[in-house]
């Protein structure tokens, strides 16, 4: 029997709706990955509602929980770590300590960093100390880095002016340590307004993918969290970078189609679960000569 991979997901959680782990855990489980959720914050709902209740996990709890897993002899079974929204830079450093602890017992474990800072259309949503931590410390420790356009621009200290510019900027991040960069949401000047674009960049190659841009009265939250989670899960299940990239685009599109059909502000993960596992659509990534 083929072994089921295990993934430690360290990011935010909302009681109502879908963001952070609440957007990523169930889809990753649905496609065949055991997920260990470690919630950096627990809020009543995501912050785009404008009001919420809840609290941030004390940073010291993160290594303590990782050590607790070690104490029962299970830490070596962890095949990957996913990190997302951070409540503080101190929390981020605690996550890196946890990643180091896991890699000490399983050197093959992957670390995907989703450097959540904000949204190209909404601006930065995290404190300056968190942005600085992501830019100066986290990127160098990640095997996979998954920024959106705002975050890519922040890493490189300038705004991208073209698709080629985005490729060059993503490739510059590889020099800091990651094996691969996935730009989850491209927003460069001159792009097609009716398309949602993504980018996959390794040291040798780059791939560009487009899917239809679906219209919503209010853009659902958690799409980036869903994207990062599914990409890592598919890699853990044996996909190549490109296969995982194409699958993720298709599965996320299926969720958005269902969400749009329901006229919902929250992602319709449960209703779309079969199409997450078996997308009906396929978007082919184009190999760029860049």
Swiss-Prot record:
HAMAP family: PdxY. ATP binds at residues 114, 151, 184, 211-214. GO terms for cellular component: cytosol. Substrate binds at residues 12, 47-48, 225. Its cofactor is Mg(2+). Belongs to the pyridoxine kinase family. PdxY subfamily. Homodimer. One of its GO terms (biological process) is pyridoxal 5'-phosphate salvage. It is an enzyme of class 2 (transferase). Its EC number is 2.7.1.35. Pathway: Cofactor metabolism; pyridoxal 5'-phosphate salvage; pyridoxal 5'-phosphate from pyridoxal: step 1/1. Coiled coil: none annotated. This is Pyridoxal kinase PdxY. It catalyses: pyridoxal + ATP = pyridoxal 5'-phosphate + ADP + H(+). Pfam families: Phos_pyr_kin. InterPro entries: PM/HMP-P_kinase-1, PyrdxlKinase, Pyridoxal_kinase_PdxY, Ribokinase-like. Keywords: ATP-binding, Kinase, Magnesium, Nucleotide-binding, Transferase. GO terms for molecular function: ATP binding; magnesium ion binding; pyridoxal kinase activity. Pyridoxal kinase involved in the salvage pathway of pyridoxal 5'-phosphate (PLP). Catalyzes the phosphorylation of pyridoxal to PLP.
């Amino acid at each position: 029997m083929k072994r089921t991979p295990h993934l430690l997901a360290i990011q935010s959680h909302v009681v109502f709706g879908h963001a952070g782990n609440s957007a990523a855990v169930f889809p990753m489980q649905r496609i065949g990955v055991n997920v260990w959720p470690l919630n950096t914050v627990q809020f009543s709902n995501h912050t785009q509602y404008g009001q919420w209740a809840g609290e941030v996990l004390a940073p010291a709890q993160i290594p303590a929980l990782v050590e607790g897993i070690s104490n029962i002899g299970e830490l070596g079974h962890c095949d990957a770590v996913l990190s997302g929204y951070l409540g503080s830079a101190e929390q981020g450093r605690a996550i890196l300590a946890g990643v180091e602890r896991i890699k000490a017992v399983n050197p093959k474990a992957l670390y995907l960093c989703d450097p959540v800072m904000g949204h190209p259309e909404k601006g930065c949503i995290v404190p300056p100390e968190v942005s600085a931590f992501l830019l100066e410390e986290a990127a160098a420790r990640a095997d996979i880095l998954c920024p959106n356009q705002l975050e890519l621009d922040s890493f490189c200290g300038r705004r991208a002016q073209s698709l080629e510019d985005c490729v060059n900027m993503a490739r510059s991040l590889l020099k800091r340590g990651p094996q691969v960069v996935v730009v989850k949401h491209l927003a460069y000047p001159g792009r097609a307004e009716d398309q949602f674009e993504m980018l996959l960049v390794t040291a040798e190659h780059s791939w560009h993918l487009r899917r239809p841009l679906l219209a919503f009265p209010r853009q659902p939250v958690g799409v980036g969290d869903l994207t990062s989670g599914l990409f890592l899960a598919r890699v853990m299940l044996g996909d190549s970078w490109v296969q995982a990239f194409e699958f993720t685009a298709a599965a996320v599109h299926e969720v958005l189609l269902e969400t749009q059909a329901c006229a919902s502000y929250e992602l319709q993960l449960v209703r779309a679960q079969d199409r997450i596992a078996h997308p009906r659509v396929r978007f082919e990534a184009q190999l760029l000569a860049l």
